């Protein structure tokens, strides 16, 4: 049995986990910074770095203690090297290097996007429903929206990506525009079932070049224009006041300050994003002859996306991660390192953080 310590600090979560044999999560600890950044309406890179510095030592210590693991029990230390906020990446990477140097345990650098893919592979293998290859991976989060062909040897081919906003970024920006605070995506998801997803018709421009690419900036602008045309200042102010007085309103509180027209708008926006994601994912899967569809990243938490994917009767298995492994975590980083460990692909202590690291 081999254990890997994973460390993740690419954005605004400080995370550590111990995974055994690529499928057993012995511990997974995540320190969120949501309360820190929420008042600013988004992630502030400088604050994120400082919060990582405060959290990294206790988070790693807790992951080791929960799993009853000593450093000398580890086969490797895996750490996110990119993509992400460079200041945040440096905190986790520097600490992982220090542990590796002090303990003599080998270091493995991991691509954050690859980690999201392996979050699904880990759980599918553990649950006895392994992913069949080639697989089509849709990775959708606040910072990424990509389509990859995933081969059995864990090599990748990029098929499509966003040309502007990521899907999760579009959710959060629209949520902020409507007064739902940060992050706004989960609030839209909670309210969407109470609206009509066909009430507001959104159209997407035909993509020039790669038809599998995404673009969400036009949709975001269309929502802005709709808001400007419907005199929504008072209700938006009411929602902002609600968030100011209570950072975590319940559903009834949201519904009390959100008229039917805005519920329809939220439902229609979510429906449009989901349609774009699944339409391009299905086209990509058909192109490569996929035997599985992997949906991962923070947007994989969206209940509407999950329901639509499972209801679409695709001719291959659809795999989502559990909610705990959808958002940023370190178990996925450790899981992604196991194939590299098997190939003895260790990283040197000179490995650098890469804010714009690509997977393929």
Swiss-Prot record:
GO terms for molecular function: iron ion binding; N(6)-L-threonylcarbamoyladenine synthase activity. Its EC number is 2.3.1.234. Substrate binds at residues 139-143, 172, 185, 189, 302. It is an enzyme of class 2 (transferase). GO terms for biological process: tRNA threonylcarbamoyladenosine modification. NCBIfam families: gcp_kae1, T6A_TsaD_YgjD. CDD domains: ASKHA_NBD_TsaD_bac. Its main location: cytoplasm. Required for the formation of a threonylcarbamoyl group on adenosine at position 37 (t(6)A37) in tRNAs that read codons beginning with adenine. Is involved in the transfer of the threonylcarbamoyl moiety of threonylcarbamoyl-AMP (TC-AMP) to the N6 group of A37, together with TsaE and TsaB. TsaD likely plays a direct catalytic role in this reaction. This is tRNA N6-adenosine threonylcarbamoyltransferase. GO terms for cellular component: cytoplasm. InterPro entries: ATPase_NBD, Gcp-like_dom, KAE1/TsaD, TsaD. Its cofactor is Fe(2+). Fe cation binds at residues 112, 116, 328. It is found in: Cytoplasm. Keywords: Acyltransferase, Cytoplasm, Iron, Metal-binding, Transferase, tRNA processing. It catalyses: L-threonylcarbamoyladenylate + adenosine(37) in tRNA = N(6)-L-threonylcarbamoyladenosine(37) in tRNA + AMP + H(+). Belongs to the KAE1 / TsaD family. Binds 1 Fe(2+) ion per subunit. The keyword Manganese does not apply.
């Amino acid at each position: 049995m081999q254990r890997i310590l994973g460390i993740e600090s690419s954005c605004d979560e400080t995370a550590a986990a111990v995974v055994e044999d690529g499928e057993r999560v012995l511990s997974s600890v995540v320190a969120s910074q949501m309360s820190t950044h929420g008042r600013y309406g988004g992630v502030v890179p400088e604050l994120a770095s400082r919060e990582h510095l405060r959290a990294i030592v206790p988070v790693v210590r807790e992951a080791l203690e929960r799993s009853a693991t000593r450093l000398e029990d580890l086969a490797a230390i895996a750490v996110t090297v990119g993509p992400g906020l460079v200041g945040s990446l440096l905190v986790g990477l520097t600490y992982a290097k220090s542990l590796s140097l002090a303990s003599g345990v080998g270091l493995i650098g991991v691509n954050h996007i690859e980690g999201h893919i392996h979050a699904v592979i880990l759980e599918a293998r553990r649950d006895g429903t392994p992913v069949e290859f080639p697989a089509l991976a849709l990775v959708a989060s606040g910072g990424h929206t990509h389509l990859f062909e995933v081969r059995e040897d864990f090599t990748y081919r990029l098929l499509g990506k966003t040309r502007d906003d990521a899907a999760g970024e579009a959710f959060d920006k629209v949520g902020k525009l409507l007064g739902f605070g940060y992050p706004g995506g989960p609030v839209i998801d909670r309210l969407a079932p109470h609206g009509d997803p066909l009430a507001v018709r959104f159209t997407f421009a035909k993509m020039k070049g790669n038809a599998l690419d995404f673009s969400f900036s036009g949709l975001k602008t269309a929502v802005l224009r709709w808001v400007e045309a419907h005199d929504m200042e008072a209700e938006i102010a009411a929602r902002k006041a609600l968030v100011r007085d209570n950072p975590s309103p319940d559903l009834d509180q949201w519904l009390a300050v959100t008229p039917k027209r805005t519920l329809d708008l939220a439902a229609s926006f979510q429906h449009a994003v989901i349609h774009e994601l699944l339409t391009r994912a299905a086209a990509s899967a058909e192109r490569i002859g996929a035997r599985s569809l992997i949906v991962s990243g923070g947007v994989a938490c969206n209940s509407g996306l999950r329901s639509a994917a499972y209801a679409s009767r695709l001719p291959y298995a659809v795999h989502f991660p559990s909610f705990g492994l959808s958002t940023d975590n370190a178990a996925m980083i450790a899981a992604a390192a196991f194939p590299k460990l098997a190939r003895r692909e260790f990283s040197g202590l000179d490995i650098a953080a890469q804010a714009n690291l690509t997977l393929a």
